[in-house]
Amino acid sequence: MAKINDNYLKLKAGYLFPEIGRRVREFSAANPEAKVIRLGIGDVTRPLAPAIIKAFHDAVDDLATIDNFAGYGPEQGYDWLINAIIEKSYKPLGVSLKTEEMFISDGSKCDCANILDIFALDNVVAIGDPVYPVYNDTNVMIGRTGDADEKGYYKGIVYMPCTEANGFIPSLPTEKVDIIYLCFPNNPTGTVATKAELKKWVDYANANDAVIFFDAAYEAFITDPAIPHSIYEIEGAKKCAIEFRSFSKTAGFTGVRCGLVVVPEEVMGTTPTGEKYSFNKLWLRRTTTKFNGASYPVQKAAAAVYSDEGWKQNKEIIDYYMENARIIREGLAAAGLTVYGGVNAPYIWLKTPGGMSSWDFFDKLLTECNVVGTPGSGFGPSGEGFFRLSAFGHRENVIEAVERIKKNLK
């Protein structure tokens, strides 16, 4: 009989969001009259920008003609999309990238998992706590860890607590690590890192021959001009950092699927015999073997994000979500809750009232307010006692949800 990958059996429970979905379905089935407002999983609700829709239509029309038909494209992505991203999104930051250093994918979540293919299992990994569950669970799945302890920490991973005391910015590891996960603007806490804070991480990585996995999925939501949008704004980062970006929240592509990875040619690893080798070359080899490229219509739509019209239209959508964030943040603060985030990120990280556990507060909001959020403990032990709300809802639902919560907490 075929044997399973028993590393999956180490996973503590169902993935966070399916568990939330299960509880909501059970509640809705028992209470069909309840109007449940979902501010949990970070799915977008606004339609795609008109310029993006037009590009989609045009690309589909291309596929209907002999002259413009597109079959298999380059696995790394079309140059016209990569160059548009570099020109519009990186050069204004003072960041210079080669076309060969960017890879278009079908989503950042997959990239954050798949990048592990090119790193040896005996690398020591450091992740924040609380953290986007994909970072933790994918390392468990591939066999990098032992079993979890009673807190939920896995042997073999270095956890970096992100708490109120440190402003939800992790401290540098006290031990040597090889791979460091950083996410700014942060999911779930909504915090951001300054250039000075990121410089400490870049210096640590270069001094210890470590590689930073920098998740910049929410960089488009930054409103403070002093906050960096890319790790490559930091001197020395191109020697030690791999950056992930997503079109899911930036352009509403949650149902379209497109992302990108930047792997600078300068980022090096070592072979078992101690020779240096380029991670860029390894990622290219992995990509050409396991991926046939994002679809032509999707890449055409993604390119429209970087047109003048698409850029303007998309900014209006992002502003809409950030106004939602303001409404949630200020409304809950007025209700007496301690809130973080929601200024440079679409997530609000709130402290549960009265020392209530994260899941108890989830059940309270669901059953008493018919509002769905995300328990902080689902992101890691240090998230216990906190709760995440998303700004990606419809405006009228956001306003109603805040009013329900305020009324309930009086």
UniProtKB/Swiss-Prot annotation:
List the cofactors: pyridoxal 5'-phosphate
- Keyword Transferase: yes or no? yes
- Keyword Transferase among record annotations: yes
Single Gene Ontology BP annotation: lysine biosynthetic process via diaminopimelate
Keywords attached to this Swiss-Prot or TrEMBL record, sorted alphabetically, are: Aminotransferase, Pyridoxal phosphate, Transferase
The catalytic activity, as recorded, is: (2S,6S)-2,6-diaminopimelate + 2-oxoglutarate = (S)-2,3,4,5-tetrahydrodipicolinate + L-glutamate + H2O + H(+)
- Where is substrate bound in this sequence? Y15, G42, K109, Y132, N187, N292, R388
Pathway(s) it belongs to: Amino-acid biosynthesis; L-lysine biosynthesis via DAP pathway; LL-2,6-diaminopimelate from (S)-tetrahydrodipicolinate (aminotransferase route): step 1/1
In short, the EC number is 2.6.1.83
Q: What Pfam families would the database entry show?
A: Aminotran_1_2 (PF00155)
On this chain, the residues bearing N6-(pyridoxal phosphate)lysine are K249
InterPro entries on file: Aminotransferase_I/II_large, DapL/ALD1, PyrdxlP-dep_Trfase, PyrdxlP-dep_Trfase_major, PyrdxlP-dep_Trfase_small
Residues binding pyridoxal 5'-phosphate are Y72, S108, K109, Y132, N187, Y218, S246, F247, S248, R257, N292
GO MF term set: L,L-diaminopimelate aminotransferase activity; pyridoxal phosphate binding
The superkingdom listed in its UniProt entry is Bacteria
Top enzyme class of this protein? transferase
Role description: Involved in the synthesis of meso-diaminopimelate (m-DAP or DL-DAP), required for both lysine and peptidoglycan biosynthesis. Catalyzes the direct conversion of tetrahydrodipicolinate to LL-diaminopimelate.
**What does the subunit section of this Swiss-Prot or TrEMBL entry state?**
Homodimer.
NCBIfam families tied to this protein? DAPAT_plant
Family per UniProt?
A: Belongs to the class-I pyridoxal-phosphate-dependent aminotransferase family. LL-diaminopimelate aminotransferase subfamily.
This chain's protein is named LL-diaminopimelate aminotransferase
Q: What gene does this protein come from?
A: dapL
